[in-house]
Design a protein with these regions (language model features):
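Single conserved hydrophobic/aromatic residue that forms the stacking wall/gate
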Residues: 1-10
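Alpha-helical transmembrane segments
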Residues: 11-18, 130-141, 202-205
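Multi-pass membrane catalytic core of lipid/isoprenoid biosynthesis enzymes
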Residues: 12-19, 34-84, 159-200, 239
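Intramembrane alpha-helical segments
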Residues: 16, 46-134, 214-221, 227
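Central hydrophobic cores of alpha-helical transmembrane segments in multi-pass inner-membrane proteins
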Residues: 18-27, 88
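Membrane-embedded alpha-helices of multi-pass transport/permease systems
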Residues: 24-28, 143-155, 159
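Small-residue-rich segments of transmembrane alpha-helices in multi-pass membrane proteins
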Residues: 108-121, 168, 233-247
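Extended hydrophobic alpha-helices typical of membrane-associated regions
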Residues: 191-254
Length: 254
């Protein structure tokens, strides 16, 4: 919303940064985890284990997108350029964290939390409290749902020496940790709305976001891990899209 005064080329560079960063992160995850994915029945059909893409081609894709991301960041402003290697370190580093820490979910949350901060830097050339609060919400929301998603791989992770919250703790305790993180996410979203007086439409989005998180924890209880699948992504997509849409409406009508 703050970018309404920017030129089309400038907006295009911000969009390209998002695409290149996501391509690099997803590609590196598939490349780094190719041997692990081949052992897991849930992921054995992914492109590299299935032989659809060679590891060398995947790595070339990652490198190309990393270079393109830095170049696009340089076009935006100096602060974006200087921070682009930090962003890439977090985005790519996440894929290695399951090898040594159960809290890889938090690193994934941090990787996604970079997005609102990066977008704010791209538009304003500075860092402020507003995007930081939004980043906290994204981090805790993402870490919370990733813990739930990882419940289905808990046994595999334990048997293969991989680390995750579900692999370390019981399903019940993992779910409680997820709930706590989602409470923090809801709190961050509420503080953001109250602090900046974002209006009624924002609070509609807040209500929808909170409701979807509650429904998620009702649907995916420890006793119903089998429900986690394609619908899991849809549920979390509804949470983010509804909150984002209502927030944009609130800012446009303020």
């Amino acid at each position: 919303v703050r970018s309404r005064g920017l030129g089309d080329v400038y907006k295009r560079q911000i969009l390209l940064c998002m695409v290149f960063a996501r391509n690099a992160a997803m590609g590196f995850n598939r490349w780094a985890d190719r041997d692990i994915d081949a052992k897991n029945p849930r992921t054995a059909g992914r492109e590299i284990p299935a032989g659809k893409i060679t590891p060398r081609a995947a790595l070339a894709f990652v490198i190309g997108n990393c270079v393109a991301f830095v170049a696009a960041a340089a076009w935006i402003n100096c602060l974006a350029l200087w921070l682009s290697p930090v962003a890439l370190a977090v985005l790519l580093g996440y894929s290695l964290t399951k090898r040594f820490t159960a809290w890889s979910h938090v690193v994934l949350g941090l990787a996604l939390a970079i997005a609102p901060v990066g977008a704010y830097i791209a538009v304003t050339g500075s860092i402020a409290l507003f995007p930081m609060l939004l980043a906290v919400a994204v981090l805790t929301w993402t870490a919370g749902f990733d813990i739930l998603y990882s419940l289905q791989d808990a046994s595999f992770d334990r048997s293969n020496g991989l680390h995750s919250v579900p692999a370390r703790f019981s399903a019940v305790h993992s779910t409680l940790i997820s709930i706590l993180l989602h409470v923090l996410a809801v709190a961050a979203v509420a503080v953001l709305g109250a602090l900046y007086r974002l209006g009624v439409w924002y609070w509609v989005g807040f209500g929808l976001f909170t409701a979807v998180l509650v429904v998620q924890h009702v649907l995916y209880r420890p006793s119903r891990i089998d429900r986690i699948g394609a619908s899991f992504g849809l549920v979390n997509g509804l949470a983010s899209v509804s909150y984002a849409a209502m927030s944009i409406v609130a800012l446009l009508t303020a």
